[in-house]
Amino acid sequence: MALIEPTAINNKKVIVGMSGGVDSSVSAYLLLKQGYQVEGLFMKNWEEDDTDEYCAAADDLKDAQAVCDKLGIKLHTVNFASEYWDNVFEYFLAEYKAGRTPNPDIICNKEIKFKAFLEFADDILDADYIAMGHYVRRSDESGQSQMLRGRDGNKDQSYFLYTLSHEQISRSLFPVGELEKSEVREIAKEMGLVTHDKKDSTGICFIGERKFTDFLSTFLPAQPGNIETAEGEIIGKHQGLMYHTLGQRKGLGIGGMKNSNDDPWYVVDKEMDRNVLVVGQGGHHPRLMSVGFYADQLHWVDRKGPIDGAQITVKTRYRQRDVACTLTYEGDDRIKVIFDEPVAAVTPGQSAVFYDAELCLGGGIIDSLIRE
């Protein structure tokens, strides 16, 4: 098993974001093993209003405390619920209201885990570094800190961290980024950590196990409308465009239809002005494909960004394979990206993250699509 070798670290204090999961648990252990002075910090980012979510958060805190007790380190707690509401949740609602599909985890990393958390660790806990259980790697070879993909290609989380600056990366450690997930679980089991077989968390943290539609409808009024084929035929009703995203296949409520084949139906467009959900058959329907996109709200890790006309690769959603592309600037905060080959289900509101081989360059928010 490829453990990270201990290094000579004297009196450097690291505050580890302890979530109650296996990745942060092993991160704390590895940093102790390397000789750091380690303390944990458990963040409460959401005020739970029902029993299941409250219990889940309480269980996470209990697991985080058990791991810290086992490792012999302090666990601090902090409540960032108001910061989360103002900076993450309100953005999430505004994007859905505008018909886009945001990624709140990316905003949470930007505003909470690597901003509010870092400030608290600095001001209150006198930290030299913070550490998280993310599957990314840090490189300092160029003279400034840069972010590389995690060693485990299936778990690489650089897509979610592209908004970090090289200054933030220089203050952050990512101990599990050099490991495979299976190795992380093996270490946790060997060390007798209660989190060794705990399921990975999935979905949006403030929704938890609740139905997404039920949750969203408590904050945004639904506006039902027609479902139409790309040819304009009305074939059903939707309960609100905000409940649907491009490329979606499940939950459309479209049964078998006369004169149509057996190919599954996909959301291929959302026409906000008419409140119409447009669907087509097949995952490569022409309305679902794009040859490129425009993006804004740019963030480059090194502050400069790639050169105009750079030929690099891009991910337009997590776990998507990299797609080769050419990037050109349309102004200080807008880019045009053309794929080498058409891509399905590129979605406004989602993040486009750019890479040069293993190096994460940064990215932006997809604003509009280029169909041809």
UniProtKB/Swiss-Prot annotation:
It catalyses: S-sulfanyl-L-cysteinyl-[protein] + uridine(34) in tRNA + AH2 + ATP = 2-thiouridine(34) in tRNA + L-cysteinyl-[protein] + A + AMP + diphosphate + H(+). GO terms for biological process: tRNA wobble position uridine thiolation. The active site is at C108, C205. SUPFAM superfamilies: Adenine nucleotide alpha hydrolases-like. Residues 155-157, 317-318 are annotated as: Interaction with tRNA. Residues 103-105 are annotated as: Interaction with target base in tRNA. Disulfide bonds join C108-C205. GO terms for molecular function: ATP binding; tRNA binding; tRNA-uridine 2-sulfurtransferase activity. InterPro entries: MnmA-like, MnmA-like_C, MnmA-like_central, MnmA-like_central_sf, Rossmann-like_a/b/a_fold. The record marks H134, Q350 as: Interaction with tRNA. Belongs to the MnmA/TRMU family. Catalyzes the 2-thiolation of uridine at the wobble position (U34) of tRNA, leading to the formation of s(2)U34. This is tRNA-specific 2-thiouridylase MnmA. It comes from Shewanella sediminis (strain HAW-EB3).
